[in-house]
């Protein structure tokens, strides 16, 4: 499900690794209305149901940050209602960068979903800002952690591991110091699932390195030993 403009990315992060490219300055982004989203989804679900097609999950992601949509709560309410009508066993999932968790309506909407896949790319302010380039330059890991804590572990934590350089600054969230800080964050949040992955497509910053699977497995191992459910995509 795409709630952002089709012609350009709209996001509260400007991640160096984002497959959608860099943010573009847009004064008045045009978003689909709640009514348009509902109508399009109902039409699609009706067709799929009529064809007796299998539907496992309805996922919100796409060309930016879906929770930026001003009617995100209403859209999720509509989606859950339509899901219940057409595919009651299907899940509703949202991929989010966690920046809008200070909004009660967004938190309420996410709690209605079956799967909340929430990002934390680094557990230090310096590395988080170098990787994610938040539009709100004052955003801190402490703030993100506090807001993620609202879900009491009932979410999937998503982290992209990478190395490289951007604007003359080193980027590496795989150093012992960065990984140790991230482990501490994981233990504080205690998510029900952890998803760690590597860059796999063209990135806006060209000077980035894909982390080998063996290294990703080494990062995952101590968490698995503690009983965490860790998915490695590499």
What are these regions (language model features)?
Residues 2-39:
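Canonical Radical SAM [4Fe-4S] cluster-binding loop centered on the CxxxCxxC motif
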Residues 3, 60-62, 159, 198:
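Short glycine-centered, acidic/aromatic-flanked micro-motifs in structured strand/loop junctions
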Residues 34, 76, 179, 212-217:
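Amphipathic alpha-helical segments in well-structured domains
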Residues 38-46, 75-82:
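Short, well-ordered amphipathic alpha-helices
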Residues 39-61:
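Short Fe-S-cluster ligation motifs
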Residues 60-65, 97:
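Glycine-rich beta-strand-to-loop/alpha-helix junction loops that act as flexible
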Residues 68-197, 202-209:
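Conserved AdoMet/S-adenosylmethionine-binding subsite of the radical SAM
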Residues 212-234:
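Binuclear metal-ion centers of metallo-dependent hydrolases, dominated by the metallo-beta-lactamase
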């Amino acid at each position: 499900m795409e709630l952002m403009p089709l012609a350009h990315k709209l996001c509260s992060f400007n991640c160096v690794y984002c497959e959608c490219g860099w943010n573009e300055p847009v004064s008045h982004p045009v978003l689909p209305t709640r009514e348009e989203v509902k109508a399009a989804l109902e039409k699609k679900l009706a067709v799929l149901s009529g064809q007796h097609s299998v539907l496992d999950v309805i996922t919100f992601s796409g060309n930016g940050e879906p929770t930026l949509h001003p009617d995100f709560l209403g859209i999720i309410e509509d989606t859950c209602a339509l899901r219940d009508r057409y595919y009651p066993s299907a899940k509703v999932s949202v991929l989010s960068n966690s920046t809008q968790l200070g909004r009660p309506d967004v938190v309420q909407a996410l709690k209605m979903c079956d799967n909340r896949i929430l990002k934390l790319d680094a557990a230090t302010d310096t590395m988080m800002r170098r990787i994610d380039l938040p539009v709100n330059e004052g955003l801190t890991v402490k703030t993100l952690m506090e807001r993620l804590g609202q879900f009491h572990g009932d979410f999937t934590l998503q982290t992209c591991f990478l190395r490289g350089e951007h604007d003359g600054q080193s980027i590496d969230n795989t150093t012992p110091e960065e990984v140790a800080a991230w482990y501490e964050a994981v233990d504080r949040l205690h998510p029900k699932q952890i998803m760690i992955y590597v860059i796999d497509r063209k990135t806006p910053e060209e000077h980035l390195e894909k982390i080998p699977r063996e290294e990703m497995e080494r990062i995952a191992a101590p968490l698995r030993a503690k009983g965490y459910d860790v998915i490695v995509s590499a």
